């Protein structure tokens, strides 16, 4: 509901919120699948650190999606005559550098902690790493195309 409120100036704010939630659920599904596979292969268990990692991944994913959607909102006002697909593509191209730089910086730190940190947090770091990979992917390649497809379908109807 926060995204609907934050994007209330754009047409159909519910679509922004629903697209962000779908992308976040994709990331949560990926890390639950990861922990299920590692549980079968290596005996990893769901514990408090896993839940902390899951919430952190959800936050990172949602924040990254909000940044892209905010740029779409800004460009909607800046380029009112541009068709929606072109505007969204422009917005993604303007934010992809920021998204990748932020996620790569976090991943470099996670790799360093994974290599040099203690064994007690390795599961946490591995889940965070997979979740950040998934979050970067889903905010750019799940949430945004879903939003565009929803808008195109509404225009066609």
Briefly describe each language-model feature range.
Residues 14-73:
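Hydrophobic transmembrane alpha-helices and their membrane-interface caps
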Residues 2-8, 101-149:
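Hydrophobic, glycine/alanine-rich multi-pass transmembrane helices and their short helix-loop junctions
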Residues 45-58, 80-87, 110-118, 153-157:
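Alpha-helical membrane-embedding segments
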Residues 5, 9-10, 38-42, 46, ...:
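Membrane-interfacial segments
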């Amino acid at each position: 509901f926060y995204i609907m409120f934050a994007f209330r100036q754009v047409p159909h704010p519910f679509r922004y919120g629903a697209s962000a939630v779908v992308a976040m659920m994709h990331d949560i599904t990926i890390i639950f699948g990861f922990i299920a596979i590692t549980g079968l292969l290596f005996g990893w268990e769901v514990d408090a650190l896993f839940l902390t990692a899951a919430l952190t991944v959800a936050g990172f994913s949602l924040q990254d999606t909000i940044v892209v959607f905010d740029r779409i909102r800004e460009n909607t006002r800046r380029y009112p005559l541009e068709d929606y697909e072109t505007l969204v593509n422009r917005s993604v191209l303007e934010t992809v550098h920021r998204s990748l730089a932020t996620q790569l910086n976090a991943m470099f730190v996670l790799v360093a902690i994974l290599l040099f940190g203690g064994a007690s947090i390795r599961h946490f770091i591995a889940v965070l790493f997979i979740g950040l990979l998934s979050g970067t992917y889903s905010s750019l390649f799940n949430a945004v195309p879903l939003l565009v497809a929803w808008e195109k379908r509404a225009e066609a109807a």
